[in-house]
């Protein structure tokens, strides 16, 4: 089983316009869809579609549209009640394909809520072959959160594999952490930032250089760098 954590889930709404977006105007949409979102949620949805057992850990009320949509699609989840609705992210699509994205802030985590999320992930990890910590972090969770959760999982006795799929400060903190994840997947720019490489564009154009650069992270204790 693959366990995913989406600390900052969202309800992703896409609105299609029949004319270009006009600031300050009232416009009618020609189409609209909404889906549960967040990296971990999307991973669990893809795994479920591929008939791979998965459980998605999601902060939010069981009656929230994100979680009812997961339930309706058959994705198993373990939710942490927060007393707040899950945020909505809105993408507006112009007729020529130009997109405008509006991302709302997520739930502000208190220390008590953070501890409860840690406990839920650890409890759900008992039967997991992989634990995937994915996506951005909401307010109240520091950049070191994923690194600290990796350490807590190992301290709890979890012996499976841990993947971290994030970016910017949380990724840097994860790589710098004492307890390393099993797998990370930085892009070329992030790989350069993590290793001190001078030109990420050179990595983008050279698979051989990328492999050599990624090897430095493998040598530092991360078995798989994709």
Report the location of each language-model feature.
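Hydrophobic alpha-helical segments and helix pairs
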Residues: 110-153, 159-160
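Short, small-residue-enriched loops and turns at beta-alpha junctions
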Residues: 107-110, 137-141, 170-172, 192-193
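Short beta-strands and strand-loop turn motifs
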Residues: 101-103, 128-136, 185-188
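Structural motif
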Residues: 1-3, 100, 129-130, 183, ...
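Conserved phosphate/ATP/ADP-binding segment of small-molecule kinases
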Residues: 148-226
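Conserved N-terminal subdomain of the carbohydrate kinase-like
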Residues: 25, 48-129
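General beta-strand structural signal in soluble alpha/beta enzymes
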Residues: 5, 58, 78-79, 133, ...
């Amino acid at each position: 089983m693959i366990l995913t954590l989406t600390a900052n889930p969202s309800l992703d709404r896409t609105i299609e316009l029949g004319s270009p977006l006009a600031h300050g105007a009232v416009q009618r949409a020609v189409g609209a869809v909404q889906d549960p979102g967040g990296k971990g949620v999307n991973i669990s949805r893809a795994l479920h579609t591929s008939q791979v057992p998965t459980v998605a850990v999601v902060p939010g009320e069981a009656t929230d549209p994100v979680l009812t949509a997961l339930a309706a699609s058959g994705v198993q989840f373990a939710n942490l009640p927060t007393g707040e609705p899950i945020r909505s992210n809105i993408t507006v699509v112009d007729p020529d394909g130009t997109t405008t994205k509006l991302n709302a802030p997520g739930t502000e985590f208190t220390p008590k809520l953070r501890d409860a999320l840690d406990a839920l992930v650890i409890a759900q990890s008992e039967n997991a072959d992989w634990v995937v910590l994915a996506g951005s972090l909401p307010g109240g969770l520091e950049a070191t959160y994923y690194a600290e959760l990796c350490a807590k999982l190992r301290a709890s006795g979890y012996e499976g594999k841990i993947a971290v799929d994030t970016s910017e400060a949380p990724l840097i903190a994860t790589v710098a952490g004492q307890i390393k994840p099993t797998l990370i997947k930085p892009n070329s720019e992030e790989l350069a930032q993590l290793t001190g490489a001078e030109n990420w564009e050179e990595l983008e154009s050279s698979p051989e250089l990328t492999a050599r650069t990624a090897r430095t992270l493998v040598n530092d204790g991360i078995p798989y760098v994709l």
